[in-house]
């Protein structure tokens, strides 16, 4: 029953599963247990999270699974919110709907959202797209681009565990060795976010330095989120960029 409870909780708090489909899945899970478990599960309520309203999310996952298995490219359209709080297909400057041709490699869940890890055909790097925002997807006959040929791949096959550890916010940019200084109260937060592969050094009663190989934009966002308790030390280009960005933020709040 405890295992079923964990599965049901994952349905309740998942942002990538539409509410109606989540309810159906929960009923199926409940049917695997006894009446006592069902009487307890009625008292479990989800937080008021913003859930996807894309009813085709499972179809998208099935198509992407098939394309990954066959090593084929896919074509899709991509949606985003506008100020009317509704999803709209992304368009080109001429007003036509923009189409994306990509090679899919993996799908992963991060912070309750399903992401597609792929290569956008025009470039030689890695891109991440929200699966619930994909529309009108179809598999193409064209063979996909091998992951080993991409920039930043190191000519190695994709390691999903390593990729997720280095891309904590699912940004697609270059990885780097980053060193930052934190207050010691944040040690647990750092390990939760970056894993136990981090290295600690230069420890004092109040602060410690952290070194980690991570996506550079993720490190930048982390430092902004937790400033001034996190200070980037290296690389210098990232430290300089953060200093300039924080200066602009300060100026934006000046009267």
Model-identified regions with their sequence ranges:
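Loop-centered beta-sheet repeat module
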Residues: 65-127
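Bulky hydrophobic/aromatic content
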Residues: 1-87
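Structural motif
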Residues: 106, 113, 133-135, 229
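Short, basic/aromatic recognition patches that contact phosphate-bearing ligands
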Residues: 1-13, 95-96, 101, 204, ...
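Flexible linker/loop signature enriched in Pro/Ser/Thr and Pro/Gly
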Residues: 123-160
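Polybasic (Lys/Arg-rich)
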Residues: 157-255
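A structural signal for short hydrophobic beta-strand segments in well-ordered beta-sheet cores
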Residues: 107, 137, 200-201
């Amino acid at each position: 029953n405890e295992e079923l409870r964990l599965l049901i909780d994952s349905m309740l708090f998942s942002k990538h599963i539409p509410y109606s489909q989540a309810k159906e899945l929960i009923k199926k899970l409940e049917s695997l247990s006894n009446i006592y478990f069902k009487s307890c599960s009625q008292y479990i309520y989800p937080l008021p999270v913003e859930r996807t309203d894309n009813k085709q999310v499972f179809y998208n996952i099935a198509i992407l699974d098939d394309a990954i298995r066959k090593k084929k490219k896919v074509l899709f359209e991509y949606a985003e919110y506008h100020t009317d709080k509704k999803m709209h297909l992304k368009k080109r400057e001429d007003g036509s709907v923009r189409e994306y041709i990509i090679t899919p490699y993996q799908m992963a869940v991060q912070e309750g959202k399903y992401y597609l890890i792929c290569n956008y055909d025009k470039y030689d790097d890695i891109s991440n797209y929200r699966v619930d925002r994909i529309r009108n997807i179809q598999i193409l006959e064209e063979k996909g681009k091998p992951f080993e040929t991409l920039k930043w791949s190191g000519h190695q096959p994709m390691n999903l565990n390593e990729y997720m550890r280095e891309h904590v916010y699912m940004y697609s940019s270059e990885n780097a060795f980053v060193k930052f200084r934190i207050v010691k109260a944040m040690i647990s937060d750092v390990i939760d976010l970056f894993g136990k592969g981090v290295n600690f050094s230069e420890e004092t009663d109040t602060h410690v330095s952290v070194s980690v190989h991570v996506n550079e934009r993720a490190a930048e966002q982390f430092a902004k989120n937790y400033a001034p308790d996190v200070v980037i030390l290296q690389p210098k280009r990232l430290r300089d960029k953060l200093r300039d960005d924080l200066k602009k933020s300060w100026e934006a709040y000046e009267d």
